Curated annotation (Swiss-Prot):
It comes from Chloranthus spicatus (Chulantree). Transmembrane segments: none annotated. The keyword rRNA-binding applies. This is Large ribosomal subunit protein bL20c. GO terms for biological process: ribosomal large subunit assembly; translation. The keyword Plastid applies.
């Protein structure tokens, strides 16, 4: 069987992979086989962490809202606030009240007191 000279095509493919892995440390940025393995691993990690990031931010927003609502009113909690928001048909996602809780706590207090009425 004759030898096939791949030419620039294989080199172009490898350099493309090397550019992706240029910030990796050690052999992970130098050796072609380990570069491809690490690239696959990195892409799997980014795909997984994109989903996990949404979960983590939602948890953070819930924690912030709950902390401010419990601080202002002793008997009031996050779950009761969200329930009252839905009862009043106020379409606020958890990101907006969390941002209000950080920047202006009194504003969140007035919103919650208006909902209770």
């Amino acid at each position: 069987m004759t030898r096939v000279r791949r030419g620039y095509i294989a080199r172009r493919r490898r350099t493309k992979i090397r550019l992706f892995a240029s910030t990796f440390r050690g052999a992970h940025s130098r050796l072609t086989r380990t570069i491809t393995q690490q690239k696959m691993r990195a892409l799997v990690s980014t795909h997984r962490d994109r989903g996990r990031q949404k979960i983590n931010f939602r948890r953070l927003w819930i924690t912030r809202i709950n902390a401010v609502t419990r601080e202002n009113r002793v008997s009031y909690s996050y779950s009761r606030l969200i329930h009252d928001l839905y009862k009043r048909q106020l379409l606020l996602n958890r990101k907006i009240p969390a941002q209000i809780a950080i920047s202006n706590r009194n504003c969140l207090y007035t919103i919650s007191s208006e909902i209770i009425k």
